[in-house]
Amino acid sequence: MRKLLYVAALFVAASCASGPPPDEVAAQAAKVYYDQLLAGKYDQYVDGFYCPDSLPNSYREQLIVNAKMFVGQQQDEHRGIREVRIVNAKADTARHVADVFLVFAYGDSTTEQIVVPMVEQEGVWYMR
């Protein structure tokens, strides 16, 4: 009986020490990136995209302009995005990728579910 309790205690300690599951970490990262977009921090949103090489400055500026245009379009069509919620996430730890399902709650009371593909690089989750 004592051995069983010892093994159970080891299992609980190991599971607690491992941290949150990768799908939860990817989901939180995706939400943070979209929260930055909604807060008008377009450069930080763009920095959330995975780029194995450095981006030319002109291309990065285009991505920032596109992000601003997207927010403006959502404002025109739906009175803006009020909130971003995490619905679900599925991670493939062998391939270091995840699909995060988010819901946009719009100002006109409609919602839309989107899928954000994510990739993990050196312990950081980025949007693809």
Residue ranges and their predicted role:
Residues 83-128:
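Exposed beta-sheet edge and beta->alpha loop/turn motif
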Residues 3, 37-42:
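Short, compositionally biased low-complexity segments
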Residues 34-38, 47-53, 96, 100-104:
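N-terminal non-globular leader segments, chiefly Sec-dependent signal peptides
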Residues 16-39:
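Short, low-complexity N-terminal intrinsically disordered segments enriched in polar/charged residues
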Residues 27-28, 43-93:
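Short solvent-exposed beta->alpha transition segments
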